[in-house]
């Protein structure tokens, strides 16, 4: 991972984009020679590791940086499915059951929040968040939701203190009430791929 002198992830994202672009080129050149299943295996071998490696750390950046990776992901999905250059990719992601960069980030945050909610994290992390019922005693429908930390800057919005409660509060209760981590992960995947 690359971190520059201004503590931004721009150099790392440039590196990831460069590696993904090479792999997209390989997928594009082989698009008419390999089956969809084989190209999907190539995607998960050549591209997916660059997107997921320490994603929860470096993906907390500006959307403009992540959009570069997302556009390369869209090119890769078009190559896997032999779609036209301007084909709409949302149905292709769903058909192939591939998560885009934003959904991968959401999944990572949801997994962290599940561990927090079920006290599976080290003691250092146990007092990061408060539920609304801990802040006030009113019986509201959002009493069980985590309180979102107020932010004055965009940099704070990139932190887990802000993103964690936002993601957790958006999940349906049938998912957040689960106690098994593998089941939770599968249900969140289904929720994101809808």
PLM regions: where:
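Hydrophobic/basic alpha-helical segments
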Residues: 1-194
């Amino acid at each position: 991972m690359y971190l520059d002198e201004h503590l931004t992830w721009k150099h790392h994202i440039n590196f990831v984009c460069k590696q993904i672009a090479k792999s997209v080129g390989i997928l594009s050149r082989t698009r008419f020679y390999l089956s969809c299943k084989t190209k999907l295996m190539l995607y998960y071998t050549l591209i997916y590791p660059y997107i997921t490696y320490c994603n929860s750390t470096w993906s907390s950046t500006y959307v403009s940086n992540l959009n570069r990776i997302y556009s390369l992901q869209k090119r890769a999905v078009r190559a896997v499915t032999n779609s036209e250059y301007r084909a709409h990719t949302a149905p292709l992601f769903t058909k192939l059951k591939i998560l885009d960069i934003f959904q991968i980030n959401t999944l990572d945050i949801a997994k962290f929040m599940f561990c927090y909610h079920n006290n599976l994290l080290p003691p250092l992390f146990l007092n990061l968040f408060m539920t609304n019922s801990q802040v006030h005693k009113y019986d509201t429908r959002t009493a069980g939701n985590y309180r979102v930390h107020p932010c004055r800057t965009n940099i704070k919005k990139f932190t887990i203190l802000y993103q964690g409660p936002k993601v957790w509060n958006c999940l349906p209760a049938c998912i957040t009430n689960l106690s098994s981590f593998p089941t939770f992960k599968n249900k969140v995947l289904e929720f994101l791929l809808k």
